[in-house]
């Protein structure tokens, strides 16, 4: 990339370069000049492309503290104006769109004014603004800064899916030899963190086992970990306890019964696609008969059940996707999460190929909408990613009262997170001003060997971060 940027005021060049790479790649070998002018109560951006020998202007009223870094945002928007590019999400890229709307509301906008800014300034379409508003209204009913959430990462899977970029290692691969020591280290970390939380000012409101595939844990280890958790964590304020039991090839009825015994009330059962050829291509084993058995038993045990599907898997056609969607009628699920595949650099899929079939966006969205209406579900959380396919958002739908609090808190980065296990990211969220949060993070090693070796040191450093929260707030 040989993009050259010139401006008459200081801006974040790296941010503009990344925006150009994803949203305006025609300009990557160009020389771009931005002239930023402030006139009365307006900000004006004049942008010129040397390669295209074109220029344009974008001006907007100075919004003050209602948005973060208006000049930088306007520089990015002016590039879309220069190329006459139209996206459903306008200039919003790789961000949590609902946080943009929530900030506008925090800083004094009503929904009418916020919609105008999203449409006229950020260039978002009415359809996506409607989605944002629906999600934010539900989130505002459930967001809670007065508690924390607990995340436990199990970095093992039966096989590594090619699209996956998460902390995960094949249980039967070389790293699998650290499994037993990992479990022992996790039990120790639960004890250490539990002791600290007894002195911490905020109680836990949600618990989430992720990974990896947490249900890769052997039955006896699953019981040991869950028992240790309940022995050391105050459950009095816990509203939900989720276990990401995503793969049927890691599950049996006994494991479901153990989860239920130790207060897990939500699980995910994630086919991702019902097309067996697709699942083979991405190295994901799937037995439909066992999946249906597990689903049936989970319903008997009265778990709240989420199901994940991915749109845009390699070589999947519109017909393949519609076939998967049509089969949802056979499952009485409480949540449905639709992911649009984003090629992550850490995934094998990114390294092997970036080719995907063209699919009929409008037809697929129409079918999704029909399904969620039939199941009495509404969107309750969403997020976007870079490198995502054309229309680009991941949406969680839920029946009323079955929303995942953890998902909302994590996407909105509203609540402190204490993370244990492999790859877990702990967060301290400090609300500074005008809806802008300062977030301090601490990352557990995703590599099991490193996690085991550095457990004591890492626990000490992580707890020290939480102890500093009072200093940052003062």
Can you annotate each of these PLM segments?
Residues 168-367:
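Conserved non-cysteine loop/helix-boundary elements of the Radical SAM core domain that shape
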Residues 94-99, 133-136, 167:
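Short, conserved phosphate-binding/catalytic loop or strand-edge motifs used
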Residues 362-384:
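TRNA-binding/sensing appendages of the translation machinery
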Residues 1-107, 400-474:
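Radical SAM enzyme core and accessory elements
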Residues 79-86, 106-151:
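N-terminal [4Fe-4S]-dependent radical SAM core
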Residues 277, 281-282, 311-318, 334-358, ...:
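Flexible glycine/acidic-rich beta-alpha junction loops that bind and position SAM and/or redox cofactors
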Residues 147-183:
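Canonical Radical SAM [4Fe-4S] cluster-binding loop centered on the CxxxCxxC motif
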Residues 96-100, 104, 113, 117, ...:
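A general alpha-helix detector
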